[in-house]
Every structure is written in structure tokens, then in C-alpha cells.
């Protein structure tokens, strides 16, 4: 604080002193809080001389915080969160034990209340939707529409719900309603994916299977950017609405939408019938709405911080990079060499080889 008063009271000659030759060459600058006498320090940094900028930056940061260089090539100020950050040393064994217990309890309840045809309501729900029309395409769209209304509706009510019952209770409510509906939609798609009218047949064309496999594999790196913290998903940790900025978010601000579109196009190309096309139409429409709704909710929650991130990111993949609004760090690849992405890689490969098991389990439900 003393440096502020020194800056205001010192003669001009003091401000013209050359910078210290030992000034560190660092790469990151943090947001500088406003000072009651100087106002917004970030505006002073942009309008003052280089020497004044150095004094202001040094006076508002702790000694252990880095200072940016004056080079125009310095990385952009990081406002949001570092996605996929996972520090093993900060993990608590008891939290993961709780996670295992919660997961087991949820799966047990889901099986009794929804999956098991002798006790659950899943089959009755599927039959009710299917009886609306004899068309599997219509049933597929109806299932997606019901899920979309519930899922996006509850997401829009998150702020109100968390104030009324708390973050953890609202997450349990959100998952408890969304999970059975999502599972019903997935199982129906697996069981009826080859119904309907065939539009094209490319499964015997050389190279198509490999291209579809790669597209599906890549899609999962986009699909789950906000579920890296599984402890929040299970409400072991207090759930938060995150403002991610690094990793996949540099490529697109809505990776889940992009991943879903890639997944839908790949599966529709491979299956090639009207049921797959209707499923893709419904899922893509839902995620396009989700992208708009997500921006609206983040803008409401984070205000100017979100608007700043919005200016240097894009919905269309790589658009902000090509336009120069997003500058990738030289070591950008390190934002992907992290345990959550390794876990996604393993789970995606495992899911591919587990396709026969998932199909067999779905067939046995007769949904």
C-alpha cells in the first residue's frame, strides 16, 4: 500500500528511474483489485507509462505472484478456471470412499425404482411414450424432448433451487430426475436403432468404420469437460457452476455441444436410417439450446468475467483461434496431459469394447 502513496506524492524524477535489471521474466498476470484512491488499476496499467505499470503491478501482487512482461506476446490474463486440473496430493481418501458409497446407493435405487421390470417404472414409461405413436422415430424424439425439458428446465432453475434447498440437495434432485430419463432414452435408442427406413448403407465401405471410430473417440474429449470433478457430480464436494477457460474451452466455448454433434453425425452416418436421424435431430437441437442457455446462465452468474471470456472464445471450434481472439500458449498440449483426460481415453476405449455388453443388457430389458 505504501507504494501507492509513494506514486502519488513523489516528484516526476522518481517515476523515471530505470527498471531493475533483475526484473523476472514471467508469464502470467492476475487481475489487479481496485484501490480506493487510484480506482481501477487495470485501466491505469493500459494508459500509464511502462514504469508506472511496473510499479502498480508490483504494488498489488504478493511477493509470490508472477508479474507479466511488457511484451505484446505475453499470454492473456486468465479470468476463468483451469479445466481438468487434478492434483493427487490434494485428494482425500475419505472423499473417494464416500463417492463409492454414493455411487453404489444411486445404482441400487435406480435399479429398483426404474430398471428392474418387476419393481421399476422404466418399462411403463417407455410403453406410455411408445403408445403415443406407432413410429419409433416419433417415440425417439418424444423421449429426447421429455429429457431435454426436464434437464434444461432444472438447469435454468439452479440458482433458485440452490437458494431454497442448498447445492448438494439440488444436485441430488437434478440427478435423481435426469438420470432415469437419460437411461431410458439411451436404452430405447440401442434397442430400436435399426428400426425405421434405411436411408443409406455405408457399413461395408472400406475405411468408414475406422473414420467413425476416430470421430466417436474425439467426440468424448468434447462431451465431458464439466464432469472432471466427479466428487461434485456425486455431491460429495459442494457442486459449483464453473467458468472454465483452459484446455478444450480454448477450442470451443461449448465442447459438449460440439462433441454431441460429432457423435450424432458419426452414428447417423454408420447406421444410416430414420431412427438414427431422428435421434440426432433431437439431440443436436437440445444441445444447441443448451449452448444458448448456458451462455445466458453464465452471463447472469459471472457478469463481466464471462463477457471477457466470451470475447476470446467461440462456439464454432477453432474460430476464435483463427480470428486471433484466442492465443494458444506454447505449451498448450500440457493442458491435456492430465489425469482426467487419461481417464476419458481409457473409458472411451473401454466403452467401445463393451458395446456388446451394453447391447445385451438393453435387449434384456425389452424397452
From Swiss-Prot:
Compartment list: Plastid, Chloroplast membrane
Q: Where are the transmembrane segments?
A: 95-115, 137-157, 172-192, 211-231, 269-289, 339-359
Q: Name one GO molecular function term.
A: 9,15,9'-tri-cis-zeta-carotene isomerase activity
Expression across tissues:
Expressed in leaves and at lower levels in roots.
Reaction(s) catalysed by this chain's protein: 9,9',15-tri-cis-zeta-carotene = 9,9'-di-cis-zeta-carotene
> Biological process GO annotation list?
carotene biosynthetic process
Q: Which InterPro entries match?
A: NnrU_dom
Give the bilayer topology.
Answer: Multi-pass membrane protein
Residue interval of the organelle targeting sequence: 1-58
Disruption outcome: Lacks carotenoids in the dark and exhibits delayed greening when exposed to light.
Q: Its induction, per UniProt?
A: Up-regulated by light.
Any one GO CC term of the record:
chloroplast membrane
**EC no.?**
5.2.1.12
What EC class does the entry list? Answer: isomerase
Q: Which UniProt keywords apply?
A: Chloroplast, Isomerase, Membrane, Plastid, Transit peptide, Transmembrane, Transmembrane helix
- For the keyword Lyase, the answer is no
Asked if the record carries the keyword Plastid, the reply is: yes
Function, in words: Isomerase involved in the biosynthesis of carotenoids. Catalyzes the cis- to trans-conversion of the 15-cis-bond in 9,15,9'-tri-cis-zeta-carotene.
- Entry protein name: 15-cis-zeta-carotene isomerase, chloroplastic
Amino acid at each position: 500500500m505504501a507504494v501507492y502513496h509513494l506514486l502519488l506524492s513523489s516528484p516526476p524524477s522518481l517515476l523515471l528511474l530505470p527498471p531493475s535489471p533483475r526484473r523476472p521474466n514471467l508469464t502470467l498476470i492476475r487481475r489487479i483489485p481496485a484501490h480506493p484512491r487510484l480506482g481501477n488499476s487495470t485501466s491505469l496499467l493500459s494508459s500509464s507509462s511502462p514504469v508506472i505499470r511496473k510499479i502498480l503491478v508490483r504494488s498489488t501482487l504478493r511477493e509470490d505472484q508472477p508479474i507479466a512482461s511488457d511484451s505484446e506476446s505475453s499470454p492473456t490474463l486468465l479470468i476463468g478456471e483451469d479445466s481438468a486440473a487434478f492434483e493427487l496430493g490434494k485428494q482425500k481418501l475419505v472423499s473417494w470412499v464416500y463417492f463409492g458409497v454414493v455411487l453404489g446407493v444411486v445404482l441400487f435405487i435406480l435399479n429398483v425404482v426404474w430398471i428392474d421390470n418387476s419393481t421399476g417404472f422404466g418399462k411403463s414409461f417407455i410403453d406410455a411414450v411408445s403408445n403415443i405413436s406407432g413410429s419409433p422415430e416419433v417415440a425417439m424424439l418424444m423421449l429426447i424432448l421429455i429429457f431435454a425439458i426436464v434437464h434444461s428446465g432444472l438447469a435454468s432453475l439452479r440458482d433458485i433451487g440452490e437458494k431454497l434447498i442448498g447445492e448438494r440437495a439440488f444436485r441430488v434432485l437434478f440427478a435423481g430426475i435426469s438420470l432415469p430419463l437419460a437411461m431410458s432414452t439411451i436404452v430405447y435408442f440401442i434397442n430400436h436403432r435399426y428400426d425405421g427406413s434405411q436411408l443409406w448403407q455405408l457399413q461395408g465401405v472400406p475405411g468408414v468404420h475406422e473414420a467413425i471410430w476416430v470421430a466417436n473417440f474425439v467426440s468424448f474429449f468434447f462431451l465431458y469437460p464439466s464432469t472432471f470433478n466427479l466428487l461434485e457430480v456425486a455431491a460429495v464436494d459442494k457442486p459449483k457452476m464453473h467458468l472454465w477457460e483452459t484446455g478444450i474451452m480454448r477450442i470451443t466455448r461449448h465442447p459438449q455441444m460440439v462433441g454431441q454433434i460429432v457423435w450424432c453425425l458419426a452414428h447417423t452416418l454408420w447406421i444410416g436410417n430414420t431412427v438414427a436421424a431422428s435421434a440426432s435431430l433431437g439431440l443436436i437441437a437440445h444441445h444447441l439450446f443448451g449452448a444458448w442457455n448456458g451462455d445466458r446462465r453464465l452471463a447472469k452468474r459471472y457478469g463481466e468475467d464471462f463477457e471477457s471470456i466470451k470475447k476470446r472464445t467461440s462456439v464454432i471450434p477453432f474460430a476464435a483461434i483463427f480470428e486471433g481472439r484466442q492465443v494458444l500458449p506454447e505449451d498448450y498440449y500440457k493442458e491435456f496431459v492430465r489425469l482426467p483426460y487419461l481417464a476419458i481415453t481409457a473409458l472411451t476405449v473401454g466403452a467401445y469394447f463393451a458395446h456388446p455388453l451394453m447391447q445385451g443388457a438393453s435387449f434384456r430389458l425389452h424397452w
